[in-house]
């Protein structure tokens, strides 16, 4: 029987120390963040202001949305300034919120939950999901070349990458439950996927871990392309959802009337951006993934397909249930308290993005 412990792969000691130190500092100062939170300002129950005063700046971490805004000239229509940040991935967004350098972040199901667990109050202000979520997965399991894993049941006794602050953790726990493997019968290797490069793919290829949830986009394709001859392969996880994406913000930004008014407008355009990406996959491939990221066109098309074909619901009932499932899966496993998922959502924004996306869906561009 394998002991369920957290362990870093060989050769990652310095990186592990840095990440562990950052997380420790974040925990240490989380109470201070709560104490310092504005005690005055716009109540979260107040209607969203209509007027954006002069000088308002929104700091946003969402590179694809930035390209869509710039490509369409939408920034010129905004009565406020957007400062774009190259910040992606739940841990980085949480750190940026804690440091007070970001107003808007994008992440999957777990990052906003984890932020609240760490004492950083955030609210979800927009949600998207796969339009074809019944047949499409955002993540698959990468299997190391010599792991001798043919089916998910073979994960028993293996080393699996685990990042408690990211959706990958939820995928691991739900998969183990679905195939009847107890957590103590595997070794969970704590390894954030956002610490740079293809960290999961490299750890798999080197044999430091046996399995890891990796994105079902170019990451998975490259992994099989580069290491398939050595026996590397991928497996789909059981049929549970992994597709939700959240726009979330610190409550301190919502307490600022000017920023709250700007967020109302920004989320409208964010909804337009989702519809635009759906309708223009080739533009996204060539303009963003080739032009900005330097990918070959074939790889760029893979990424554009992964980014697109999303739906922006006008009701958050399904989104709340989706987030609650993540809380109920990870809370007991990570020793965090149960949350009511509805409290994560700012319902004042519920229809804004969905109405915007619906207003242009299917219209000629």
Can you describe what each PLM-predicted range is?
Residues 2-83, 90, 321-365:
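N-terminal hydrophobic or amphipathic helices and topogenic motifs
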Residues 110, 196-291:
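Pocket-lining segment of extracytoplasmic ligand-binding domains
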């Amino acid at each position: 029987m394998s002991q369920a412990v957290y362990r870093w792969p060989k050769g990652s000691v310095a990186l592990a120390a840095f990440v562990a130190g950052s997380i420790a500092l974040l925990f240490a100062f989380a109470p201070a963040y709560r104490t310092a939170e504005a005690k005055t300002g716009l109540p979260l129950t107040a209607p969203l202001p209509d007027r954006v005063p002069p000088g308002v700046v929104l700091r946003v971490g969402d590179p694809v949305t930035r390209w869509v805004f710039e490509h369409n000239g939408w920034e010129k229509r905004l009565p406020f300034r957007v400062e774009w940040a190259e910040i992606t991935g739940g841990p980085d967004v949480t750190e940026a919120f804690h440091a007070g350098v970001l107003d808007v972040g994008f992440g999957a199901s777990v990052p906003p939950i984890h932020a609240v667990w760490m004492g950083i109050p955030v609210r979800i202000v927009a949600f998207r999901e796969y339009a074809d979520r019944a047949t499409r997965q955002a993540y698959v399991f990468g299997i190391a070349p010599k792991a001798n894993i043919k089916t998910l049941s073979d994960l028993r006794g293996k080393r699996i990458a685990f990042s408690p602050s990211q959706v990958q953790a939820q995928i691991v726990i739900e998969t183990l439950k679905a195939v009847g493997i107890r957590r103590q019968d595997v070794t969970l290797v704590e390894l954030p996927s956002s610490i740079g490069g293809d960290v999961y793919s490299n750890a798999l290829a080197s044999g430091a871990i046996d399995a890891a949830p990796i994105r079902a986009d170019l990451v998975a394709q490259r992994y099989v392309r580069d290491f398939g001859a050595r026996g590397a392969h991928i497996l789909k996880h059981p049929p549970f959802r992994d597709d939700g994406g959240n726009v979330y913000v610190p409550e301190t930004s919502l307490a600022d009337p000017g920023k709250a008014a700007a967020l109302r407008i920004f989320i409208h355009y964010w909804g337009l951006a989702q519809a635009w990406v759906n309708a223009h996959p080739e533009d996204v491939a060539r303009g963003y993934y080739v032009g900005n990221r330097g990918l070959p066109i074939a790889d760029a098309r893979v990424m554009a397909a992964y980014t697109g074909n999303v739906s922006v619901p006008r009701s958050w009932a399904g989104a709340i249930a989706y987030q609650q499932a993540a809380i109920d899966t990870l809370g007991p496993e990570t020793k965090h308290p149960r949350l009511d998922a509805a409290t994560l959502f700012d319902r004042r924004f519920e229809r804004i993005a969905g109405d915007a996306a619906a207003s242009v869906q299917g219209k000629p561009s």
